[in-house]
A protein has these predicted regions:
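Short basic, glycine-rich beta-strand/loop surfaces that mediate nucleic-acid
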Residues: 179-188
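A glycine-centered beta-loop-beta connector
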Residues: 27, 35-51, 98, 106-121
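Tandem CBS (Bateman) regulatory domains
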Residues: 1-10, 49-86, 90-99, 113-114, ...
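Short, charged, intrinsically disordered terminal tails
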Residues: 193, 199-215
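Short proline/glycine- and acidic-rich turn/helix-capping motifs at secondary-structure junctions
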Residues: 172-179, 209-215
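Basic, Lys/Arg-rich alpha-helical nucleic-acid-recognition elements, primarily the DNA-binding modules
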Residues: 1-49, 56-59
């Protein structure tokens, strides 16, 4: 999946000379937390978050204070080193940017112009859709040797039980580099037969692992 499939293309922007008060009103009206700051050519020159606004106007939270700070221009508080993405970037690459740089939104540029934006909420919804977690079904986690063809073998056992696989995730076993964990989302509310067959074939089923499920 690529970025242009999940990005929002209607992006609220402001100029560097707009006031902090304008940003606050826009955030409240549109229920957003980030505003890209652009020039007349729609090139991103900064970004302002709700945290930047709070840090830039601490006195407005005191009853006896002046609200003159609200008239300060956004260029005084905006972040200028903006990390950006491209519409053809893979979603997992963008997720890595969020993780590595601890950001919560990413302006998307094409030919240096702003064409969209992605937030951490967008990534969360995408993860839910990719894993099928929003659909009825069951999750099965299996510890398997790290070798070629193992995914095909385990999927074959699930297939023999006429259970449709909604999604598959694969990640390393943190305790043993010779193993990996397969996480299946299957379209059945009762995975007992699948689990029993997996265990009969010698696979280590990590989840479900509860009373009533044979070992």
């Amino acid at each position: 999946m690529i970025v242009e499939e999940i990005m929002k293309t209607k992006v609220e922007t402001l100029k560097a000379d707009d006031t902090i008060e304008t940003a606050i009103k826009l955030m409240r009206e549109k229920k957003i937390k980030h505003i890209p700051i652009t020039n007349d050519a729609l090139e991103v020159i900064g970004i302002v978050s709700d945290r930047d606004v709070k840090d830039g106007t601490p006195s407005i939270f005191h009853d006896d204070s002046s609200t003159s700070e609200l008239q300060n221009p956004l260029k005084l508080i905006m972040k200028k080193d903006v990390i950006t993405g491209h519409p053809l970037d893979f979603v997992e690459e963008v997720a890595a940017l969020f993780y590595e740089h601890r950001i919560s939104c990413l302006p998307i540029l094409k030919e240096k112009k702003l064409v969209g934006i992605i937030t951490e909420t967008d990534l969360l919804y995408t993860l839910i859709q990719l894993t099928g977690a929003h659909q009825p079904g069951s999750q099965i986690e299996v510890k398997v040797p790290h070798k070629a063809g193992i995914l095909y073998e385990v999927a074959g056992i699930i297939r023999r039980n006429n259970s449709n696989i909604q999604s598959v995730l694969v990640y390393p076993d943190k305790k043993d580099e010779n193993f990996k964990i397969l996480v299946f989302r299957v379209r059945t509310m009762n995975p007992m037969n699948v689990i029993d067959d997996l265990k009969k074939e010698g696979y280590d089923v990590l989840w479900p692992n509860m009373p009533g499920i044979s070992s």
